[in-house]
């Protein structure tokens, strides 16, 4: 199978590929697309060459086989929830963490493993392939420990007997993230759980998580940070506007180092509200300078006028069909038994913003350069332009999903989440070969 692509050659990818077993046609396809993407990301981020080889081999043998059949049309046979609403159903997306002044960029990927039982009545929640992959990681990656995950996971499973109810709730319930730092010899694994039953989400803070944490850490576990989130969301005038999504992330590492991430959303888009959540109602101070940086970035990525008062909501956005595009703002709270207060991270959804993907990316890079944060942020632009044609970045949406923002050591720590758009672009660019129409990926 040949590939016709506009992506720039990455020598280390070509060298690694030269001696790899070809695998089946599906694996060849996903490796030549996503393997090249990963190689470009690591090259631009300045990973040591031996680390690039190590991570590429991990990707080829421990990620690619889980991506399922190659596309045969622009409609996915199973629409993965990786990448959220911006994505096209592809079972993988990527992130680029820009780093801070003393930490260089590093990359991650997020996948929903697909297996023989995916999209069948035998596995309506698509759990089998994911759990098998996590078990494999625990056998092959010395740093991976699944004690917390195996303890938490049963608490998130729906207890449903009626077939009709299960059919209504079928869909993704687990995702996996793999973080590959340039300065490490390990690959850090994260699992993300999605309760499918609405009543489970409402019980998350009061029943499910307290019991899961006691089961994992012992009856005397300190729940201060979890209880703080519950109190903040029920008693604080800003916090009570938050809504639980049910999504929960957990580190697959030694129990004492495991973090539990609880995801929430708000529909209040005023910057004063965003700042109140980031500071936990003033309990976690952030300097006025950093709040000013966050405000400027928030307005620019959302296409809001700079003079908009911080107490005002963002202008309502209109879709091409003239319907209203509701804006939600996701956050997560990072819960750890040893912490009294949770850490907070905000997510800026650019997939629904009036700002083009390229303009959003340029805005973030300019911000980092202006404030001396991150290391070589323009390398990120090289990655985006290599994965997605510049014209598409200028005129279409969907390549970029979110930017996340946290505060680390008096700097904004920014991460970009973006999509390969394998299905969306499958027939977008076609070439003639021997009189036949073929995708650029073939």
From Swiss-Prot:
Pathway: Secondary metabolite biosynthesis. Keywords: Transferase. InterPro entries: Aro_prenylTrfase (IPR033964), Aro_prenylTrfase_DMATS (IPR017795). GO terms for molecular function: prenyltransferase activity. PANTHER family: INDOLE PRENYLTRANSFERASE TDIB-RELATED (PTHR40627), PRENYLTRANSFERASE ASQH1-RELATED (PTHR40627:SF4). Belongs to the tryptophan dimethylallyltransferase family. This is Prenyltransferase nscD.
């Amino acid at each position: 199978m040949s590939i016709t692509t506009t992506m720039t050659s990455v020598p280390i990818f070509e060298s690694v590929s030269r001696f790899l077993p070809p695998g089946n046609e599906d694996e060849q396809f996903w490796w030549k697309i996503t393997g090249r993407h990963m190689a470009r990301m690591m090259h631009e981020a300045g990973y040591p060459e031996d680390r690039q080889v190590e991570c590429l081999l991990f990707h080829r043998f421990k990620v690619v086989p889980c991506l399922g059949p190659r596309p045969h049309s622009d409609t996915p046979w199973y629409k993965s929830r990786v990448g959220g609403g911006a994505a096209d159903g592809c079972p993988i997306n990527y992130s680029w963490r820009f780093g801070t002044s003393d930490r260089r960029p590093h990359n991650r990927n997020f996948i929903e493993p697909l297996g023989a039982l995916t999209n069948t009545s035998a596995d309506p929640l698509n759990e089998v392939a994911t759990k098998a992959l996590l078990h494999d990681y625990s056998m092959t990656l010395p740093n991976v420990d699944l004690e917390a995950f195996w303890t938490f996971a049963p608490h998130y499973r729906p207890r449903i007997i009626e077939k009709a109810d299960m059919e209504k709730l079928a869909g993704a319930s687990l995702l996996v993230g793999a973080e590959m730092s340039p300065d490490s010899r390990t690959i850090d694994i994260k699992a993300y759980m999605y309760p499918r039953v609405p009543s489970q989400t409402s019980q998350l803070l009061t029943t499910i998580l307290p019991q899961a944490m006691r089961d994992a850490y012992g009856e005397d576990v300190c729940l201060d940070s979890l209880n703080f989130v519950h109190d903040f969301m029920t008693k604080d005038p800003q916090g009570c506007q938050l809504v639980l999504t049910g999504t929960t992330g957990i580190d697959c590492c030694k129990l004492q180092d495991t973090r539990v991430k609880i995801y929430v959303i708000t529909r209040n888009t005023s910057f004063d509200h965003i700042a109140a959540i980031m500071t936990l109602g003033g309990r976690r101070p952030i300097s006025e300078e950093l709040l000013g940086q966050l405000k400027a970035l928030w307005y620019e990525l959302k296409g809001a006028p700079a003079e908009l008062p911080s107490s005002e909501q963002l202008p309502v956005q209109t879709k091409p069909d003239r319907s209203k595009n509701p804006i939600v703002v996701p956050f997560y709270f990072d819960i750890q038994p040893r912490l009294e207060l949770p850490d907070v991270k905000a997510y800026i959804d650019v997939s629904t913003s009036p700002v083009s993907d390229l303009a959003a990316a340029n805005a973030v890079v300019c911000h980092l350069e202006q404030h001396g944060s991150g290391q070589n942020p323009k390398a990120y632009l090289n990655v985006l332009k290599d994965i997605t044609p510049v014209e598409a970045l200028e005129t279409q949406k969907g390549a970029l999903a979110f930017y996340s923002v946290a505060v680390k050591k008096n700097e904004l720590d920014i991460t970009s989440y973006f999509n390969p758009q394998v299905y969306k672009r499958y027939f977008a660019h076609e070439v003639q070969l021997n009189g036949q129409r073929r995708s650029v990926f073939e």
